[in-house]
């Protein structure tokens, strides 16, 4: 590859394998498929089962839908090795996670005496991370769903290979639409990457298969998508007029309670009143408050700040609900999403990233991903590209090094747009930031308000960890590394390098000493080491200040000094919480930067806050909302549906011991109930635990129960991705997911028929007498919100049917029983033994 019309004629062999495991030296290939792509078309496909190994584990059978009978008459790999080698000859070997498929196939060839060495390797995972920058996950089925590619039977080699081939074609076509300047930049960046992406880009540029720069504006060495402007003034409209238009256009059912909600919210906006409003799930509160806000703006020209809890809800409001209302009134409704400034790409930080030479794969991919994303984004909101782990750390480091310059292009543009919008939308975490930046707005609507307190507490918290601080100092580097120190030395006299290196060595040792003191809970030693670190950093800053090209390294180390000062102040004022105590490298120090009183003071100019939720009232009242309202009066309103969870039954076993993770009988009882469910229904099941210790013990017990041999056990560990586990759970038919509180909310359980979820404990600790008032003010409301969210996993719609098994009798014999169960019909709350549970399952 590289010149002439090679790209036009080049063949790609897209390979996918299904195997009995992940070890290429021990496990076997059970299905192989090769799809040949040429000239952006699929021209051939070869697929076969293989019989080198026919005994399959339950997990492999469930994952692939391949059973032993399909393999019995299939060839062995040695029988087809020559044919496969011929198919691959002269092609670019391509796969989704190419290291896995290439490694397995190369090992299989080797066992047949064939030395397979392709000239080029291409990984569609790597390509997707760069050229599909908005994707959050890169499993093939997730990408296929996002792009609308057909993949009805994931984890079968024939369908996976074809979907990967279609993905490759999509990626190549997208690369060809990029302007030549960007592609040349991507080509130079990609050279150090492990696989042969640079050759593909070179061929595209050489053959002039590129787009133009129309609709783009240049910023230094890169382009940004030019955003189209234009505003129209809204015509005045009452709540009733907007609601009638919405119903007529959408064809939705007219609901008196929904219109009542809209009018109540409009009145609170108009009168500048505080309002706490609980409205049951399904009443349509989002459309109700949007109609109230739009009418309020059209009549009075005043803007409203709306806050909600999750990205998916923000997307629903801005893309789906707003579009329905725009169609109803026949004109666009200006709205803008806004967050804190640090959540938008800092162009100065990006320029710095591009200027630094670094062959680290993650940094290269980050640079390339950002170059592509800037041609697409209208907002510059970093959440669009889901920076995680090293990517996030590298960008944050560059942002610190860039300092407070003029690079906040996207944030400033969002602020300008907010000044002309009907409403500004944010999420709870950034609510206070938006209140700070929008002093003209004095009215706030908080949707999903039961989540607000937790989000604000998270926002007020800064976390210090051993690994993060080591990484931060490591970014300064050594003279031989292409990082900050080497860049500084290249512009200055090298005589000072020994002093700087010595200081960095001491700072690294200082981090070890700080976290050793934290591990030992020795506050005096910790403060001594913090002060020592501050002095070392001051010496470093003094040594570089005023020299040539010192600003980047100075900004970086000055930020580190501020980190140490903040940590020291928190330790002295006892504003911290420690997490972890066994492993030095996993210890975290959570520091509270502000309290709720200071947040209320920052929001002092807000005249009216309307809090909305499906789960807001607790124990007949709203007193727990005083963390936000303080001593200001507020109205309250409940629009309830006594049969909200009418399709969900709650079963509480009466024949199990009290909750005790050290009681073998209690653990055995949980396992027995799980086994009964599996044997009676044959359906998938999710079991949620309050801690990993109990989860691990239950998992250990399942190994001795025969029922579990026919089911895949998905077990969450401290290192597991809950998203990946949920994806596997939704894909499999016969499986059990053992998880923790990370699955309590925001998940979509996919199951045919009745959904079942088992909960080992109500989501709060046993109340302590010494903390009784705090229990009713904080712990109980939070537990009720969590419990209703969990119930909402098994019944998302009125027609759904669900079963919630709760191994916690407190829900029946404590004063707070009705607080948890008020939306469940009494006949749906069942207490019984194992036999009655079997009867319940048979009647589902």
Sequence positions of predicted segments:
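Signature of the SF2 helicase/ATPase Hel1-core->accessory helical subdomain module
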Residues: 315, 323, 400-423, 427-538, ...
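Conserved pre-motif I regulatory segment
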Residues: 231-276
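Walker A/P-loop
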Residues: 271-292
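Conserved RecA-like P-loop NTPase helicase motor core
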Residues: 654-665, 717-813
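A contiguous, basic/glycine-rich beta-loop/short-helix subdomain that forms a polymer-engagement track
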Residues: 399-424, 434, 539-666, 715-717, ...
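Acidic two-metal-ion nuclease catalytic site recognized across multiple nuclease folds
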Residues: 2-7, 170-241
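Conserved non-catalytic scaffold segment of RNase H-like nuclease domains
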Residues: 2-120, 133-155
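A substrate-engagement module of RecA-like helicase motors
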Residues: 240-244, 302-303, 307-422
């Amino acid at each position: 590859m590289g010149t002439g019309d090679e790209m036009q004629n080049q063949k790609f062999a897209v390979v996918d394998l299904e195997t009995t495991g992940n070890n290429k030296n021990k496990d076997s290939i059970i299905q192989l498929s090769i799809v040949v792509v040429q000239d952006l078309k699929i021209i051939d496909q070869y697929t076969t089962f293989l019989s080198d190994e026919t005994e399959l584990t339950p997990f492999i059978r469930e994952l692939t839908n391949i059973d032993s009978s399909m393999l019995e008459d299939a060839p062995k790999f040695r029988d087809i090795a020559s044919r496969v080698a011929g198919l691959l000859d002269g092609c670019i070997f391509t796969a989704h996670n190419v290291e896995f498929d290439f490694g397995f196939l190369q090992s299989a060839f080797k066992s047949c005496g064939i030395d397979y060495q392709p000239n080029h390797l291409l990984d569609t995972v790597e390509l997707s991370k760069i050229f599909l920058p908005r994707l959050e996950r890169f499993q093939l089925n997730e990408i296929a769903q996002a792009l609308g590619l057909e993949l009805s039977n994931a984890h079968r080699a024939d369908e996976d290979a074809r979907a990967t081939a279609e993905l490759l074609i999509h990626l190549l076509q997208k690369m060809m639409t990029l302007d030549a300047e960007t592609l040349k930049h991507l080509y130079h960046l990609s050279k150090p990457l492990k696989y042969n992406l640079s050759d593909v880009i070179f061929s595209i540029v050489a053959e002039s298969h590129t787009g133009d720069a129309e609709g783009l504006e240049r910023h230094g060495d890169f382009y940004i998508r030019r955003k189209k402007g234009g505003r129209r003034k809204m015509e005045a409209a009452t709540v009733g007029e907007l609601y009638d238009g919405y119903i007529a256009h959408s064809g939705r059912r007219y609901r008196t309670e929904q219109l009542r909600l809209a009018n109540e919210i409009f009145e609170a906006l108009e009168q500048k009143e505080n309002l706490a409003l609980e409205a049951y799930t399904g009443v349509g509160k989002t459309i109700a408050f949007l109609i109230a806000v739009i009418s309020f703006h059209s009549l009075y020209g005043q803007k409203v700040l709306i806050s909600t809890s999750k990205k998916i809800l923000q997307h629903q409001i801005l893309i789906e609900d707003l579009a329905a209302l725009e169609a109803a009134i026949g004109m666009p409704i200006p709205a803008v999403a806004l967050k804190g400034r640090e959540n938008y790409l800092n162009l100065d930080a990006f320029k710095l990233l591009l200027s630094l030479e670094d062959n680290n794969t993650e940094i290269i991919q980050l640079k390339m991903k950002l170059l592509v994303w800037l041609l697409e984004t209208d907002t510059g909101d970093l959440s669009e590209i889901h920076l995680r782990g090293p990517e996030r750390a590298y960008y944050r480091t560059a942002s610190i090094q860039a300092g407070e310059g003029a690079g906040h292009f996207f944030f400033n543009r969002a602020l300008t747009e907010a000044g002309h919008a009907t409403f500004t939308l944010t999420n709870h975490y950034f609510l206070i930031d938006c209140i700070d930046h929008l002093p003209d707005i004095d009215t706030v609507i908080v949707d999903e308000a039961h989540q607000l307190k937790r989000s604000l507490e998270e926002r007020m918290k800064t976390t210090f960890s051993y690994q993060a601080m080591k990484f931060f100092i490591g970014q300064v580097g050594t003279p031989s590394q292409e990082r900050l120190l080497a860049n500084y030395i290249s512009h200055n006299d090298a005589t000072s390098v020994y002093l700087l290196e010595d200081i960095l060595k001491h700072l690294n040792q200082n981090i070890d000493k700080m976290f050793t003191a934290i591990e030992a809970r020795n506050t005096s030693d910790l403060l001594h080491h913090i002060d020592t670190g501050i002095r070392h950093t001051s010496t470093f800053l003094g040594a570089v200040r005023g020299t040539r090209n010192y600003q980047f390294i100075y900004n970086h180390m000055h930020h580190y000094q501020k980190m140490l000062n903040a940590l020291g102040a928190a330790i002295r004022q006892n504003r911290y919480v420690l997490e972890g105590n066994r492993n030095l490298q996993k210890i975290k120090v959570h520091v509270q930067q502000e309290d709720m009183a200071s947040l209320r003071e920052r929001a002092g100019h807000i005249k009216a806050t309307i809090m909305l939720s499906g789960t807001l009232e607790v124990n007949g009242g709203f007193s727990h909302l005083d963390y936000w309202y303080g001593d200001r009066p507020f109205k309250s309103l409940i629009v309830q549906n006594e049969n909200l969870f009418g399709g969900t039954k709650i079963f509480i076993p009466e024949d199990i011991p009290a909750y005790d993770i050290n009681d073998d009988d209690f653990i055995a009882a949980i396992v027995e109930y799980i086994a009964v469910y599996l044997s009676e229904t044959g359906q998938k099941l999710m079991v949620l635990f309050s801690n990993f210790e109990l989860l691990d013990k239950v998992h250990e017990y399942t190994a001795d129960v025969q029922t579990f041999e026919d089911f895949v056990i998905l077990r969450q560990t401290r290192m597991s991705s809950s998203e990946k586990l949920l994806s596997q759970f939704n894909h499999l038919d016969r499986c059990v997911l053992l998880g923790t509180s990370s699955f309590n909310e925001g998940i979509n359980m996919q199951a045919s028929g009745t959904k079942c979820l088992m909960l080992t404990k109500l989501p709060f600790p046993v109340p302590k007498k010494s903390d009784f008032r705090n229990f009713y003010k904080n712990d109980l409301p939070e537990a009720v919100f969590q419990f209703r969210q969990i119930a909402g996993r098994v019944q998302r719609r009125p027609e759904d049917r669900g079963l919630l098994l709760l191994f916690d009798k407190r829900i029946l014999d404590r004063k707070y029983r009705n607080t948890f169960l008020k939306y469940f019909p009494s006949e749906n709350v069942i207490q019984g033994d194992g036999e009655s549970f079997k009867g319940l399952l048979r009647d589902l």
